[in-house]
Amino acid sequence: MNLELLDPFSIPDYPEALTTTLKHGHATSIRFSTNGYHLASGLVNGSVVIWDLSTFSVSRVLTGHTRAIQSVCWSSCDRFLLTASRDWKCILWDLRDGSIVYQVVLSAPVWSASLHPHKINTFVASLLDESPQLIIVDDGIPKHKYLPTNPDIDENYSDRRNRSKHVTLVSFFHPSGEYILSGTSKGWFHVIDASTTKIRSSHRITSQSIKQIRLSFCKRFLIFNSTDRVIRTVSIQDLDNPEVEHKFQDVVNRLQWNSCGFSQTGEFVFATTYQMAHAIYVWERGMGSLVKILEGPKEELVDVDWHPVFPCVASVGLDSGSIYIWAVEQKESWSAFAPDFQELEENIEYEEPEDEFDIHDETGKSEEEEYFTSVVKILPHDSSAEQPFVMPPTLSSS
C-alpha cells in the first residue's frame, strides 16, 4: 500500500468490511509483527507460516514442532519469533534464514510463551496444570525458574481446599522487563519480580478464570478476558494499585468471548465471540459503547489481532483454519500526491494538439532511456535508534 496516495483525513478509526482471506494450512494462532509488515500464523500440524502483507504471499514456512501451535510472539526488532506448541516445546526462530536459535523442552504442554522485551534468550511460559516457568538460555543451556501462582495473603477455607486446582493460565513480561504479569484460574492478577521470582502484588480482578491478558500499544493498559463473560480494561500506570476502567459485555445474549485486544491507538477494544455469533465486537474504550460488529465468516472465530499501524483486524476461523482480514477499502487520492492532478467525475473527449506526437530528436530520446526511475520507495522508519529488520525474500522454483 502506497501511503503517499492515501488521504489521511478519510481513514476511519476501525475496519469496516471483510477484504481478504488467507489460506495456507489450518491456522490456530496469529500475530502481526511490531512494524506491521508481516503476519505470523501457527498451524495445527506444528508449522509456522510468515505472511508478507504487502503482497499477501507466504514469505517463510518454519517446521520444527510436531503438534498444534498455541502461541506466537515477535521480538521487538521483528527478526526473531518465539513459538509455543502442544508438543511441550518452545522454539526461537531467526527469520533472516529460518534457522532455529534454540529450542526448550518443558515438562508439560504449553499454553502460551512470551519473550522478554529486551533479551531474546529469556522468556516466560504458561504450562498446562503446572506452575509457569521463567526460562533463561545461556550458551544453549536453559535454566528454569518456577513462578508462584498462589497469592501471599490469607485465603478462605474453600480457596485452601481447592489450592491444587489453582493454576496460572497466562503470563507475560511487563514492557520494562523487570516484572512478569500473570493471570490465574481463580481470577488473581499477579505482579512478579523477574529477578527474585517473588510476587510483588496480587489483585483479585474477577472470581472466574482469567483466560487472556493483552497489553495495549501504549504499554499503559491491560485488557482481561475471563470466563464470567466480561471484558475488562485495567490501567497499570501504578502496578501496586491497578484500576479497572471499563467493563464490556453483551447484556442481552450473555456471549462468551474467545479472544480480545486493543486497537493501534488504544481508543477501541475488540473481542471475538464464542460458538454461534461468528462476529467481532468493537467498542469505544472511552465511552464503553458498541460501535461496530464485524461479520462475514460462517464459522467461529478464535484468535484475533489488530494491526499496529492501520485500522485492520485479522482473525482465525475455527473450522477451516483460514485467516480473515477486515480493513478499510481505501480510495487512492492522486491529488494528494500531485497537486496539479485533476480527478474527473466522468470521461471527457480529449482534443489532440497537432505537435503532440511529433518525432523527437535522438538526443532527447537517449536521455530518457538513460534516466532511471525508481518504482519502489521505502519509507523511513519512525525510530532513529534502530533500523527495523527487513526479512530477505525467499525464491522458490516452481
From Swiss-Prot:
Keyword Repeat attached: yes
Pfam families reported in the protein's UniProt record: WD40 (PF00400)
Keywords for this protein: Nucleus, Repeat, WD repeat
WD repeats: 22-61, 64-103, 162-202, 247-295, 296-336
Subcellular locations according to the entry: Nucleus
SUPFAM superfamilies: WD40 repeat-like
The organism's place on the tree of life at top rank: Eukaryota
Main location: nucleus
Gene Ontology biological process terms, A to Z: transcription initiation-coupled chromatin remodeling
Function noted in UniProt: The Set1 complex specifically methylates 'Lys-4' of histone H3.
Record note on quaternary structure: Component of the Set1 complex composed of ash2, sdc1, set1, shg1, spp1, swd1, swd2 and swd3.
PANTHER family membership: RETINOBLASTOMA-BINDING PROTEIN 5
Protein name: Set1 complex component swd1
Upper lineage: Eukaryota, Fungi, Dikarya, Ascomycota, Taphrinomycotina
Gene, per the UniProt record: swd1
